[in-house]
Amino acid sequence: MQLSVKVSRFDPDTDSEPRLEPWTVEVEEGARVLNVLDAIHSLDPTLSYRSSCRAGQCGSCAVKVNGEPALACTEEAADGMVIEPLDLPVIKDLMTDLVSGISSIPRINTCDCGIIPKQEDIERIKPLRDCIECLSCVSVCPAMKVTDFLGPTSMRSQMRIALDPREPGNRVREAISQGLFTCTSCNRCWRVCPKNIETPGKAIEKLREIAN
């Protein structure tokens, strides 16, 4: 089938601002956004975008489709769609700088305590451990745009680690210093999460309960 789309193009070395470039390509029925990008790339190899697993498991292909974050490999392509980068610093075209966002996600501390998590510990952690670090939630977080809030995926990670009996640190105190109480509970991070992680209710509100 034939699809006409618009794709954001931006090269910081030559452009002062992004522009939407129109393309019409042939793709198979049921094609995903990533298939459209591949088709455009076959015609113009200078188009920059990321992809890896092509199965919705790595998060590397996250972009905005008609203004909303989505994984390019799982989002169905549609005629007239507009494909743009996430609201993160743009390296080129649809490629964004993920380093600062991913490097700020808290990691569990090394523990020589010999503690083995029980099944109930694992069950409590499960709703928070499916994150694929696509940073879609970071892209839409209004609090991050106006404060020093470290972001929803960082809070999700803090709560996940706080629930781990092997963790020796005070994760609630860390979360407070990272802007825990600046979250507005707008739920936008939950709505755009490709893994449907309920970060506001399962992480941020829980951390606030412990803090109080």
Enumerate the language-model features and the residues they cover.
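Ferredoxin-type iron-sulfur electron-transfer modules in oxidoreductases and energy-metabolism complexes
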Residues: 31-43, 87-88, 94-129, 133-212
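Iron-sulfur-associated redox domains of electron-transfer enzymes in respiratory
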Residues: 1-96, 142, 147
